[in-house]
Amino acid sequence: MKKTFTYLSFIIFLGWFPSLFAGEIYVSLQGNDKNPGTKEAPFNTLNRAIKQAREWRRLNRPEVAGGIYIRLEEGVYAQRNSLFLRPEDSGTPDSPTVICAVDGAHPVISGGVAVTGWKRGCNHPAVPEKLRQKIWSVEAPLIGNRRVETRQMWVNGHKIQRAAQFPDGGLERMIDFNPEEQTITIPVSQNVNPKRLQNAGQLEMIVHQRWAIAILRVKSIDVKDGQAVVRFHEPESHLEFAHPWPQPVIGGEKGNSSFCLTNALELLDQPGEWFQEYPSGTIYYYPQADENMETAEVIIPALETLVTIDGTLSRPVKHIQFNGITFEHTSWMRPSYQGHVTLQGGFPLLDAYKLQEPGLPEKAELENQAWITRPETAIRVRGAEHIDFKHCTFRHLSSTGLDYEWAVTASSVEDCQFTDIGGTALLVGAFPDGGFETHIPFIPADVRELCSHITIRNNFISNVTNEDWGCVGIGAGYVRNMDISHNEVCHLNYSGICVGWGWTSLESGMCNNRIEANYVHHFARRLYDAGGLYTLSNQSGSVMRNNRIEHLIEAPYATNDRAFYIYLDEATDGYTMENNWCPAERFDSNRPGKKNVWKNNGPQVADSIKYKAGRINQD
């Protein structure tokens, strides 16, 4: 009798609490999008699974009650267009949509395509006779009716250097930078032989300019008397020579600014270098000694954005979580089409110039103006709430990894790994772009436009900024109530964690941001005017505490020594800096406000604080 009563009670319990049971949708590389999406008969694509979940919600099906779990089986899910999530895909607090791995699987969402059919030997006249049998070539894959064009290639999981002067002996110092003539003069030497590059139609110059780089497509090279005068294509030529900050330095404390020539078949002379000729699409590669091109896995990216989550202020996308997913292989093609000249943090300039008479109503001493755009990103989130990434991996991405771009609230990135990323690992918040001049305080009419209550916690970020050296580990612009804590951020070419934008002392909505217990190390490897922890502008009620910052690298091509463990850049105000450990009190403040408070920062901070910084509960 007791057993019967228990059984009946359980049945009644199920009837009254259907929300305990979630709907499940399965995706497998062996599946079919005509299947019902069950474990036994899964779908083949994530797009189809998302559509199924959307329909369940539209029809208010019983499967929605306890949430929808889209489970991906093992495999690489190649995307040929960005996965698009919209307000109709929203979950609820009691019924989220979770995109996750089946138990024990490690699914990958990829924008890459395999490159196969390599042939040994290259008879191109740009290649010296002695190297022709060492170089392999292949036609790039076709997608649609076009050969894939790329600036990135991975061989057996390792990113390969494009053919460049750089691995042949490091960067070289320029001789002159001439804004009036729009030219850069470089030496002719054993390392730099511009004569043989005069017919290299895809040649680029990487210019080292303080806290940023420029990538300029070379238009012409005129060689005379041991020097070469280089001119560049538009629009980047105008931008490079018109924008005052940052420009290359001539006559710096440590010499002139540096440069590197890259992307020419004539430079393909070292193992581990490659070049793609366009419009033919042919790829040339000089393999390393341990690589067998008949069996090597070679991947090039064919997509810039893997996932787009796009809502509005009135209809945000809500309650979607990614758990245990790897995102990899995205491209970044902007420099190939229009060059790449940035203001700071990897943000490309649309226009910039020096004011003949300084001053704006918002900033009387301002001497320059700049309009920027946003870098490409693997995952873009706009107009959203409760969009969470947990235990995910972001790798082999060519620009930004993940971008909470606009009007995102109550969202988190936790226990994730970001490695081998060309730009910034994580971007958050407004960096006003388009027609909004970037030095004017951004004060939106609706405060919901500001990203708020974003948590970035317990993540590992390493080897990012490896294409655009001026990017950062974590970059936050106009944000409020942000929590950046217990992350390890390392091996960066510029700054580690950067919060703030605008160079303004005025109130703008940035406030109550927390940078706590992070471990930042091995930064400023190539650029300077950097900070392990870096801030800009007025951010009332913000704190920077219990962080550990060390291994500030003396960038070999810097023209001065401006790099710091903590750097409060222009107009930083409203911060309390407390109990931050670093091996020396190497700090700087650039025209700060009056409400900053410094308490016990430097090598004297207790080990009990120092060793608690960084990730916790590491896998």
Question: What spans do the regions from the language model cover?
Answer:
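Extracellular beta-strand solenoid repeats
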Residues: 71, 84, 98-100, 108-110, ...
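Boundary at the C-terminal end of the N-terminal hydrophobic targeting segment
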Residues: 20-22
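Predominantly extracellular beta-rich ligand-binding scaffolds that present long acidic/polar faces
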Residues: 80-87, 94, 98, 560-562, ...
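Extracellular polysaccharide-degrading/modifying enzymes targeting complex plant/algal/animal polysaccharides
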Residues: 26-383, 388-393, 434-445
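Short glycine/acidic-rich loop motifs that flank beta-strands on beta-rich extracellular proteins
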Residues: 59, 81-82, 331-337, 376, ...
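Right-handed parallel beta-helix
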Residues: 318-329, 365, 385-396, 408-423, ...
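Bacterial N-terminal signal peptides that target proteins for export
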Residues: 1-9
